[in-house]
Amino acid sequence: MSKVQSITRESWILSTFPEWGSWLNEEIEQEQVAPGTFAMWWLGCTGIWLKSEGGTNVCVDFWCGTGKQSHGNPLMKTGHQMQRMAGVKKLQPNLRTTPFVLDPFAIRQIDAVLATHDHNDHIDVNVAAAVMQNCADDVPFIGPQTCVDLWVGWGVPKERCIVVKPGDVVKVKDIEIHALDAFDRTALITLPADQKAAGVLPDGMDVRAVNYLFKTPGGNLYHSGDSHYSNYYAKHGNEHQIDVALGSYGENPRGITDKMTSADILRMAESLNTKVVIPFHHDIWSNFQADPQEIRVLWEMKKDRLKYGFKPFIWQVGGKFTWPLDKDNFEYHYPRGFDDCFTIEPDLPFKSFL
């Protein structure tokens, strides 16, 4: 059989997916976090891998799914939160635009799996399966009640799950995880299709979503999940020291308010008294595509007049950020390589060839 005859759609998928293979898994495992620092990697959407100076590994909102894949059904699912929000009927054209940079089934060293809320792009059955199958049998799954309900429904033992609500603190080795109030109003209208939201007081946010503050020996990280802007960010900033804050940013389509704008991101950072603010979530959905440079432009316009005490950082999916080593950087660039040029003699026809 010739090579072209032996190749199938399945063999093509297995040879190219996930796009980064185990490259990032290996990078994270090999990373030695220096004392007085923490390292984190952006996994896409609001997915974050955090590693402390003590070698503690936790992942938050790691999602391995995708968006729309077919024009087959031109209508939105009845009762979808976006339909409730804007009274729309047409299918939402939200295609995933970000590659898969971490292989969940190549994960071996992990100390906790966390989710901020139960929306499909923030909690993942494949991650749960991979951790259950390949990692230590005491790795906890931490999240609000709706997330724990999902995990247990997928087959994660109830005793492996920890339900958190605002005010709760969970210690995972040298990382202290504080569950804080979430401000994700979209979560409150994510309801069963037959349940009406109009004229009904929403149930509590606390069972549906939380924000997290990760206190590590090398600094503190604030993860806001899918939260919108809220005045209560200032309360969190008053009560906690925050070094780096992550905020869900995007260009909201007409009739929709689901992501923070550039102005919201700056207000969040100012309210939290953070040193660095990093937008995320803008990478993942084609119909919420936004340019994070807008945040920096607006910051440049306002920083001197408003005496901002923080800087924005523009990240790339799969990239690493180390606090405090990267605190004065404005943008991430993937490693460019070739730092060992002329280690050996070039093999060129003559010196001036290039």
Curated annotation (Swiss-Prot):
Record-linked SUPFAM superfamilies: Metallo-hydrolase/oxidoreductase
One annotated GO biological process: L-ascorbic acid catabolic process
Catalytic activity: L-ascorbate 6-phosphate + H2O = 3-dehydro-L-gulonate 6-phosphate
Swiss-Prot/TrEMBL cofactor(s): a divalent metal cation
EC top class, as a word: hydrolase
Main location: cytoplasm
Compartment(s): Cytoplasm
CDD domains the UniProt entry points to: UlaG-like_MBL-fold
Molecular-function GO term, any one: L-ascorbate 6-phosphate lactonase activity
EC number(s) reported in the record: 3.1.1.-
Function: Probably catalyzes the hydrolysis of L-ascorbate-6-P into 3-keto-L-gulonate-6-P. Is essential for L-ascorbate utilization under anaerobic conditions.
Protein family (similarity comment): Belongs to the UlaG family.
Protein name (record): Probable L-ascorbate-6-phosphate lactonase UlaG
The organism's taxonomic lineage, starting at the top: Bacteria, Pseudomonadati, Pseudomonadota, Gammaproteobacteria, Enterobacterales
